[in-house]
Structure formats: C-alpha cells, structure tokens
C-alpha cells in the first residue's frame, strides 16, 4: 500500500475526526476506524465521483437535444389530444352532456393539470 501525504485545512481535519468519533460511538473498534482509514475512504469516494463526472463529460448524451425532442413530443401529444377531444365532443353519443362539451373538457383538464403542477411546484407568495 502506498503512503500519501497531503495537507488539508483544519476544518477538514475536524470533520474527519467527527466521523471517526461517530463510528467509534456506534461501536467500531479503534483498530477498525482511524483517521487514516476514514481519509482513505473519503479519497476513494472522491475519486469515484471525479471519474463519474469525467465519464459524463465524454458521454454522447446531449441534454439540450434531449429537451428539444421531449418538448416536441409533448407538443405533438397535446395537439393530437386537442383534436381527439374536439372530435369526441361532436359525437352523438355524448351530445347534450355538458361534461363532454369541448370548452368544459378543456377547463376540467386545465384545473387538474394546475392542481398537479401545484403539488410538484408550489407557488411562492413571496415572489
């Protein structure tokens, strides 16, 4: 095993010592948990994160292109569904039922979408 010497800030030393203390308080033996073992673990984790980020940069995935395709599909779906709702509202099977009038269906959909969006993206009164 190679020996590595690195200089870190006092804050980092403090945080590593807190991890060591917490592990020992949880019942780990002093031979199992040390400043060195925790530092090695954190260094390995940091290296994995760094390598994962580098792989992402080299990836052929293009977020902007993905967003464009996703938006295009959503708009096509919205347009298609609007046409289907229009056709359905003219059906003689639902004629006279206000629940299936086009304007009422659109309003109902908007209300349901609005409540779902509010659930995930609550409006802030402060803005």
UniProtKB/Swiss-Prot annotation:
Keywords: Conjugation, Cytoplasm, DNA-binding, Plasmid, Transcription, Transcription regulation. Signal peptide: none annotated. One of its GO terms (molecular function) is DNA binding. Gene3D superfamilies: 1.10.287.2320, TraM protein, DNA-binding. Disulfide bonds: none annotated. SUPFAM superfamilies: IHF-like DNA-binding proteins (SSF47729), TraM-like (SSF140581). Pfam families: Tra_M. It is found in: Cytoplasm. One of its GO terms (cellular component) is cytoplasm. Belongs to the relaxosome TraM family. Homotetramer. 2 homotetramers cooperatively bind to DNA although they do not contact each other; cooperativity is achieved by DNA kinking and unwinding. Part of the relaxosome, a complex composed of plasmid encoded TraI, TraM, TraY and host-encoded IHF which binds to the F plasmid origin of transfer (oriT) in a site- and sequence-specific manner. Interacts with TraD. Also interacts with TraY. Conjugative DNA transfer (CDT) is the unidirectional transfer of ssDNA plasmid from a donor to a recipient cell. It is the central mechanism by which antibiotic resistance and virulence factors are propagated in bacterial populations. Part of the relaxosome, which facilitates a site- and strand-specific cut in the origin of transfer by TraI, at the nic site. Probably autoregulates its own expression. Plasmid specificity is conferred by the TraD-TraM pair. This is Relaxosome protein TraM. The lineage of its organism: Bacteria, Pseudomonadati, Pseudomonadota, Gammaproteobacteria, Enterobacterales. The gene is traM.
């Amino acid at each position: 095993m190679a020996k590595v010497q690195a200089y870190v800030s006092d804050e980092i030393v403090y945080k590593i010592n807190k991890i060591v203390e917490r592990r020992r308080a949880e019942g780990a033996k002093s031979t199992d948990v040390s400043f060195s073992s925790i530092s090695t673990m954190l260094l390995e984790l940091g290296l994995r994160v760094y390598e994962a980020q580098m792989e992402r940069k080299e990836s052929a995935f293009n977020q902007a292109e993905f967003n464009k395709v996703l938006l295009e599909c959503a708009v096509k779906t919205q347009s298609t569904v609007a046409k289907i709702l229009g056709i359905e509202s003219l059906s003689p099977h639902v004629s006279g039922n206000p629940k299936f009038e086009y304007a009422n269906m659109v309003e109902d959909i908007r209300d349901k979408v609005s409540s779902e969006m509010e659930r995930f993206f609550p409006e802030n009164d402060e803005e």
